[in-house]
Amino acid sequence: VDILTQILLNHVIVGENASTSLSTGYVSTLATQSNSDLNLSMFVDTSNGVRLNGVSSVAIPDIDATNGIIHVVDAVIGLPTIVDQALANPAFSSLVAALSAADGNLVSVLSGEGTFTVLAPDNDAFATFLNGAALGDVPTDALANILLNHVLGSVVTSTDLVGAGAGYTSTLASGPGMSNLSLYFNTTEGVRFNGVSSVAAADVVTTNGIIHAIDAVIPIPTVVTFAAADPNFST
């Protein structure tokens, strides 16, 4: 499917969604990732009118047709990358600030081509992690590695995680000898990472990957981290 077709499909949502039925959160459009059949997500913000992906607002709502409803918008809604979706959702403003401040040009990396899974801490998670400190107090190289500890190098959906049940995967964070640090996941009670952070909103699909919103920053792990998180080490 060509880009123009995908952009048009990115303006179509299944079902009749009157403006009064829309609420802040994510919906799926008919556009898909180029390398999968996953439907792209759209962030709807109803805090001040109806704003879509942070770039377009509903100008004329609720034009009824025989097979659906049309909402006239004031800007074309482009195909969103991971960074686009982070920018669209005010709950991720601290994450965007951290990505911008860290070494490694992470905003560019996560805006570019690739297939990533980002575990995205919300603003409350960053506030708890910083514990009164400023983002600028964290060395930029350390901040980059902490952020990369939330990035996987492939698309992993919540269905994939639940299907696996529990186990280890690799993040893009650097460990000893430049090896990639591991991440432990367990789906016994929701989806939990390294025993410290849980998925609050799953499967925000973008052109270059997927986002899972999480409720806590995942620190760089030690041996004790995995011993405490993995029930196989409980005895």
Residue positions per predicted region:
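Mature, structured domains of secreted/extracytosolic soluble proteins
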Residues: 1-235
